[in-house]
Curated annotation (Swiss-Prot):
ATP binds at residue 742. Its EC number is 6.1.1.4. This is Leucine--tRNA ligase. GO terms for biological process: leucyl-tRNA aminoacylation. It comes from Mycobacterium tuberculosis (strain ATCC 25618 / H37Rv). InterPro entries: aa-tRNA-synth_I_CS, Leu-tRNA-ligase, Leu_tRNA-synth_edit, M/V/L/I-tRNA-synth_anticd-bd, Methionyl/Leucyl_tRNA_Synth, Rossmann-like_a/b/a_fold, tRNAsynth_Ia_anticodon-bd, Val/Leu/Ile-tRNA-synth_edit. It is an enzyme of class 6 (ligase). A motif ('KMSKS' region) lies at residues 739-743.
Length: 969
């Protein structure tokens, strides 16, 4: 039996109502707070939302089988910031709770839980500023978030909650890292395989080494070097985004379009550092192709497709002479999607960071060099050094979109493989090292950027596709090949095939598919993150720790601040905070060849590590033997082709969160999941079967003449002006619309709304504001509408003056109420299942208004009980309370949800608007099953229609069944 704070006339009334005109038993904020607190305690005490697993500690104690009809609902978990929640944060959480509660009521076994993404830079920055340890601050923030979220009455299985900073959680993050580290991608099988199988192939001779080397004759170090080249996790001297102001490197996705850090807005520079990388590029095809089987917003799929960026083309080799004394020949590998234009390539451009640049730089300028090509340098080397310094702070986007074309001639030439002609080699910032090969063949006649560059530097422009006027601009359309030797007269597709065949036969090129996607930079020079399960020997060679050595716990250190540099110091070098923990760093270990000294890796994993697999831990959060039992993953996430079709990849049934994670978390988690799938650890090919992106709640903010924000709640609207009552009198302020935030002084805490109206009111208001996917403006003044709706529902059941239940038993419903009820049941059921909570709310309000008008005294139980049931997913606390007061003894959390009777979904009569020459002139009501001839007769004999016709006979009578009748005269 559940307990109620208000049941019966003896329930506790509002404490401040003794001398008030407010009825003693009205639904008020104070009453809402009491019943919400009580029902939340009841749910927690009874384990109402605890959901069973097939096996393990959360399996049914009696060994009973779990229901087959399961549903896994997941939110993108929050980062527990120090500012706490504002009213925009719960939008998606409320929506998924309504969804989960509805399906729980109709009998499905629903898993819904919420954890915290607690590692990362913000906590570390705050700790450095305040002197508070990141763990202390993070744990306090989690407590506050749990309190705030708890007030909203979410039906989460609290046993499954965790933080990514929990040692029991990040132990398995480290374990998954080791699985990826100890795997390689077999391009023949198109999947990851254990490194042990690669070693076995080398040992047996099934796989040969490059250069004909004998595996058996390699030293242990040489074998390790070979294997490291195959691993899915590897170290490389990579071109990285170095942010001196943060003291760490950043992934491409963490750098803004204007070349600054998305956290802190510091300058970011490109430089080479030895870093851990994950070979996500091996999965580019699968990541791209499997988007087709996902039920995701097309916008997100398009963003991932563009980020992966598959291009079909060819590689051509341009030979050149190195500038060293021996002048050895090097091949410059160029990727192009237009091999048909190779005869029009009149110069090459390398990215300034390209590996071959320094080898190809001439000692001096050739005689007669065009001054435009020299960048004002006395030698090519001086010019290139100056140019590199000038572009160091530019973002990739700036480099590609800059209208001014800049570059430097290397003083050397390459040979065009199509015609044997020498072409000058330049570097320019519009070519990126991270795309293709980092080198392009420039065809100014048919590429506008190349045309602009050629015009700026006085380079030749050759037409090889007929159809344009290349003296005015590049021609990028279709046409016939010209000035291209054996390709002349061919179409573009035919020329592509012919030139690729010629390049392949000459050993100077081949067809190839390229991707924009780059390998994932997987190391940060920070403290607050997961330590790597890696140690280094005295030679600096990395060694993975055994799984038995996990977890590698993050040490508590007195100095956890990163070494920060002048934000503009591009030449600075990272120094991780963990390097200061010398006792932790230096360890003696036996890794199979005796006790030896090792040093731990002092980098930490990026913030995305924990979120790359956390959905799996929800399925089995207490398992100490595996990250999750296979049976539990298969039950909650395994493919269900009978339900979702033959191509079902499996995964979480519904995942809700922001679209801003499209090419970060969502791409990384897909990569990790696919590796785990390949290695046999999971049965699902994808982590998230269905994705929904919620919109944002936005609000007005106000700035004074200096651009400083003022508290939005104190701003007064006067006509078309806004004023702020400052300490020196009123000042005019200016309105802007956008994000909610503490710094914008327009933040509203959910605590404020819960205190003023109750949590159910907040839930109803946020769900009624519009479609889930759409952004919407917050208006505190409008919250009262949801509050009054719940008060009307309360009055249908409870007498506000006596506290008695006021429903009428044994009263049959009239036909209008029956139709209204069953239409509402159908509509609300469909809306809840489709996440259309705004229209579900509107239908519930409409039905409530019908009952309020129809039944001034007692409402029939048969009419109001279904309303309470339908309200339960949306406003669960008041629904539970009313359900109890209606005489029920069990919680509504597991149903029942009312079912519609189809007999009441059909109208007995239909009203037809009658148009005369397209304008409505009357209306007739006929039986729903009236045939067309009878309908026409009823229209023509209607008094209003006859009066308008004034004796005229219509030339034509047009009937649109169920909608209208049109008379043409």
């Amino acid at each position: 039996m559940t307990e109620s704070p208000t049941a019966g006339p003896g329930g506790v009334p509002r404490a401040d109502d003794a001398d008030s005109d407010v009825p003693r038993y009205r639904y008020t904020a104070e009453l809402a707070a009491r019943l919400e607190r009580t029902w939340q305690e009841n749910w927690a005490r009874l384990g109402t939302f605890n959901v069973p697993n097939p096996v393990g500690s959360l399996a049914p104690p009696d060994g009973a089988a779990v229901p087959d009809d399961k549903l896994f609902v997941q939110d993108m978990f929050p980062y527990p910031s120090g500012e706490g929640l504002h009213v925009g944060h719960p939008l998606g959480y409320i929506a998924t709770d309504v969804y989960a509660r509805y399906f729980r009521m109709v009998g499905r076994n629903v898993l819904h839980a919420l954890g915290f993404d607690a590692f990362g830079l913000p906590a570390e920055q705050y700790a450095v500023q305040t002197g508070t340890h990141p763990r202390t601050r993070t744990e306090a923030n989690v407590v506050n978030f749990r309190r705030q979220l708890g007030r909203l009455g979410f039906g989460h299985d609290s046993r499954r909650s965790f933080s990514t900073t929990d040692v029991d959680f990040y132990r398995w993050t480290q374990w998954i890292f080791l699985q990826i580290y100890n795997a390689w991608f077999d391009t023949t099988a198109n999947k990851a395989r254990p490194i042990s199988e690669l070693v076995a192939e080398f040992e047996s001779g099934a796989r040969c080494l490059d250069g004909g080397r004998d595996w058996a004759k390699l030293t242990a170090g040489e074998r390790a070097d070979v294997i490291d080249e195959y691993r899915l996790v590897y170290r490389a001297d990579s071109l990285v985004n170095w942010c001196p102001g943060l003291g760490t490197v950043l992934a491409n996705e963490e750098v803004t379009a204007d070349g600054r850090s998305d956290r802190g807005n510091f300058p970011v520079f490109r430089k080479r550092l030895r870093q851990w990388m994950m070979r996500i590029t091996a999965y580019a095809d699968r990541l791209l192709d499997d988007l087709d089987v996902l039920d995701w917003p097309e916008q997100v799929k398009t963003m991932q497709r563009n980020w992966i960026g598959r291009s079909t083309g060819a590689v051509a080799l341009f030979s050149a002479r190195a500038a060293s004394d021996d002048g050895f020949e090097v091949d410059i590998e160029v990727f192009t999607t237009r091999p048909d234009t190779l005869f029009g390539a009149t110069y090459l451009v390398l990215a300034p960071e390209h590996d071959l640049v320094d080898e190809l730089v001439a000692a001096s300028w050739p005689a007669g060099v065009n001054p435009l090509w020299t960048y004002g340098g006395g030698t090519p080397g001086e010019a290139i050094a100056a140019y590199r310094r000038a572009i160091a702070a530019k973002s990739d986007l700036e480099r590609q979109e800059s209208r001014e074309k800049t570059g430097v001639f290397l003083g050397s030439y390459a040979i065009n493989p199509a015609n044997g002609e020498p072409v000058p080699i330049f570097i320019a910032d519009y070519v990126l090292a991270g795309y293709g090969t980092g080198a392009i063949m420039a065809v100014p006649g048919h590429d506008q950027r190349d045309w602009d560059f050629a015009r700026a530097f006085g380079l030749p422009i050759v037409e090889v596709i007929a159809g344009g006027n290349i003296s005015e601009s590049a021609y990028t359309g279709d046409g016939i090949l010209v000035n291209s030797d054996y390709l002349n007269g061919m179409s573009v597709p035919a020329a592509k095939r012919a030139i690729v065949d010629r390049l392949e036969s000459a050993g100077r090129g081949r067809a190839r598919i390229e991707f924009k996607l780059r390998d994932w930079l997987f190391a940060r020079q920070r403290y607050w993150g997961e330590p790597f399960p890696i140690v280094y020997d005295s030679d600096g060679r990395p060694h993975a720790l055994d799984e038995a050595a996990l977890p590698v716990e993050l040490p508590d250190v007195p100095d956890y601040s990163p070494v920060l540099f002048d934000p503009d110091d591009a030449d600075s070098e990272p120094s991780p905070p963990l390097a200061k923990a010398t006792e932790w760093v230096h360890v003696d270990l036996d890794l199979g060849d005796g006790l030896k000294p090792y040093s731990r890796d002092t980098n930490v994993m990026p913030q995305w590590a924990g979120s790359s697999w956390y959905e799996l831990r929800y399925t089995d959060p207490h398992n100490s033997e595996r990250f999750c039992a296979k049976e539990n993953e298969a039950y909650w996430m395994g493919p269900r082709p009978a339900e979702h079709g033959p191509d079902d990849p499996g995964g979480v049934d519904l995942y809700v969160g922001g679209a801003e994670h499209a090419v970060l978390h969502l791409l990384y988690s897909r990569f990790w999941h696919k590796v785990l799938y390949d290695l046999g650890h999971v049965s699902s090919r994808e982590p998230y079967r269905r994705l929904v992106n919620q919109g944002y709640i936005q609000a007005y903010a106000y700035t004074d003449a200096r651009g400083s924000y003022v508290p939005a709640e104190q701003v007064i609207e006067r006509g078309d002006r806004f004023v702020y009552p400052g300490p020196d009198g009123e000042v005019e302020v200016f309105q802007e619309f956008g994000k909610i935030g503490k710094s914008l002084k327009n933040s509203v805490s959910p605590d404020e709304i819960c205190d003023a109206y109750g949590a159910d009111t907040l839930r109803v208001y946020e769900m009624s504001m519009g479609p889930l996917e759409a952004s919407r403006p917050w208006a505190t003044k409008d919250v009262v509408g949801a509050y009054r709706f719940l008060q009307r529902v309360w009055r249908l059941v409870v007498d506000e003056h006596t506290g008695e239940t006021r429903v009428a038993d044994g009263v049959e419903l009239d036909i209008d109420t029956l139709r209204a009820l069953h239409r509402t049941i159908v509509g609300v059921s469909e809306d809840f299942a489709a996440l259309r909570n705004n229209t579900a709310t509107a239908k519930l309000i409409e039905y409530t208004n019908h009952l309020t008008k129809k039944h001034r005294d007692a409402v029939p139980r048969a009419a109001v009980e279904p309303l309470v049931q339908m309200l339960a997913p949306l406003a669960p606390h008041i629904a539970e309370e009313l359900w109890l007061r209606l005489g029920n003894t069990t919680s509504l959390a597991h149903g029942p949800f009312p079912k519609a009777d189809a007999a009441y979904l059909v109208d007995e009569t239909v009203e037809y608007p009658v148009q005369v020459n397209g304008k409505v002139r009357g209306r007739v009501v006929v039986a729903a099953d009236t045939d067309e001839e009878t309908l026409k007769a009823a229209v023509l004999t209607d008094e209003k229609v006859q009066a308008f016709l004034a004796g005229a006979t219509p030339r034509k009578v047009i009937v649109v069944a169920g909608r209208l009748v049109n008379l043409v005269i």
